[in-house]
């Protein structure tokens, strides 16, 4: 289980990313066109509003590593839930 403060920090970052995504994309488009003022405006936005600062975390325990995008959970929880038959369409393979 990850620390609650780390999970809360990541939730806050996710909200900031969603809030500023459109404005950030528009500013980046203007910067690519050569507008220097847009670069200054982009620098004024919060650092945590950048998408690269958000970390994928397991929805169940907040684990930041071993994240499986398809299911939104960590490999540890995936193995537990798949073994218990809770995840639909997933079964243990044998050949």
From Swiss-Prot:
InterPro entries for this protein: Ribosomal_uS14, Ribosomal_uS14_bac/plastid, Ribosomal_uS14_CS
Family annotation (Pfam families): Ribosomal_S14 (PF00253)
Domain of life: Bacteria
One Gene Ontology molecular-function label: structural constituent of ribosome
GO biological process: translation
Cellular component, GO annotation: cytoplasm; small ribosomal subunit
PROSITE patterns: RIBOSOMAL_S14 (PS00527)
This protein's UniProt keywords: Ribonucleoprotein, Ribosomal protein, RNA-binding, rRNA-binding
Keyword Aminoacyl-tRNA synthetase: no
Subunit annotation: Part of the 30S ribosomal subunit. Contacts proteins S3 and S10.
Family label: Belongs to the universal ribosomal protein uS14 family.
NCBIfam families per UniProt: PRK08881.1
The protein's role, per its UniProt record: Binds 16S rRNA, required for the assembly of 30S particles and may also be responsible for determining the conformation of the 16S rRNA at the A site.
Protein name: Small ribosomal subunit protein uS14
Gene symbol of the encoding locus: rpsN
């Amino acid at each position: 289980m990850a620390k609650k403060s780390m999970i809360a920090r990541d939730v806050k970052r996710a909200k900031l990313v969603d809030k500023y995504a459109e404005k950030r994309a528009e500013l980046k488009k203007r910067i690519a066109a050569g507008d220097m003022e847009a670069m200054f405006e982009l620098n004024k936005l919060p650092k945590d509003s950048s998408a690269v600062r958000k970390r994928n975390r397991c929805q169940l325990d907040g684990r930041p590593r071993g994240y499986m995008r398809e299911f939104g959970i960590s490999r540890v929880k995936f193995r537990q839930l798949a073994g218990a038959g809770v995840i639909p369409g997933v079964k243990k393979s044998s050949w």
